[in-house]
Amino acid sequence: MRLLDRGADPNVASSLNGATPLYAAVNSEWQPRTRYPQPQEREGQRFGYLDLMEALLAAGADPDERMTLHPWYMEYTGCGNAQCGLIDMKGATAFLRAAYATDVDAMRLLRRWGADPFLATEAPARRNRRTTQERIRESQVEALDNVEEFEELSDSAQATAVVTIWGDLPDSVKIGLPEDQIRTTPSEFRQIVLEHALRQDSVNAERPDPSGLPPVPQGGPAVFALHAASGVGYGEGFAGNAHRHAENGWLPSVRFLVEEVGMDVNIRDHNGYTAIHHAAARGDNELILYLVEQGGDVTAISRRGQTTADMANGPVSRVSPIPETVALLESLGSANSNNCLTCQ
């Protein structure tokens, strides 16, 4: 506040990722639990983050300034994707960051100062849109393809490596490759299992997009505020372990975006998910029912072929299924693919 009083530029942005003081004010209040320590001295300050945001806006801060890169201090590593399910903030505005925190007060403040609530994050390159499971599988196939590393493994580790890839092959292929024989002599089956896996991956890559949506190019709109406020990432990684948001803020923030801002409840993110998909991944039955009342489509299919019920049924490994939400969505008309990855 003293810097603003002395004429500091409220729009000065980080040369590393484009973060402005306005974005930082929201982010510091709701910084996720990451591997990096987060300064806490601000909690003893006289002015709160909303006071600072209003002062920045009054001094001329651009409410629609966008992030140019995802900030390094909002990452995890070793999860199969860089953020462990946390949203990729490239292209995000302060308004979208507030929506991600389910912070209605901050969203209202920003909108009052002219923020555009319809600006989305930017879609990454297509190769970077894979799920945690897809990335894990890719690394497993690459490991199997490395002959030298494979030969250094113990017999049991070799068997596990081959059987893991074998387990993802079509049943028609597995019939001709008995599991007991693979476990006995994994080195003899390594190459043939690898070839089948690569062939299957090639076939999968040529399949039409199950969502029926046109592709989103790199740099196109990815995640909108409605997705951020409904739980984007909870069904795509382990965001639930790190994400911080306003207490009991899910429904109020979505209601604000739908009823006051006018967002379409069926708007899709770059992966083809709707707000119902994201609410389902968290088991938020109250929000699901609200979205349905507002015209939400429970039959929507994502680009990964997941129904809304699938998102509540262990959509990635180590994310537990939520039977009550699966049952609710089935009763509302969603199909259930019975593909619980946590249960496998």
Language model regions located:
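Ankyrin repeat A-helix N-terminal signature
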Residues: 24-49, 75-90, 97-103, 130-146, ...
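Ankyrin-repeat and related helical/solenoid repeat scaffolds used for protein-protein interactions
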Residues: 266, 270-310
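Long, low-complexity, polar/charged, intrinsically disordered or flexibly structured peripheral segments
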Residues: 174-205
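Start-of-repeat signature of ankyrin repeats
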Residues: 17-18, 70, 91, 124, ...
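Leucine-rich solenoid repeat scaffolds
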Residues: 298-342
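Ankyrin repeat domain, specifically the short helix-to-loop turn at the C-terminus of the second helix
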Residues: 1-9, 54-62, 108-117, 252-264, ...
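Ankyrin repeat boundary/linker residues
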Residues: 14-15, 67, 88, 121, ...
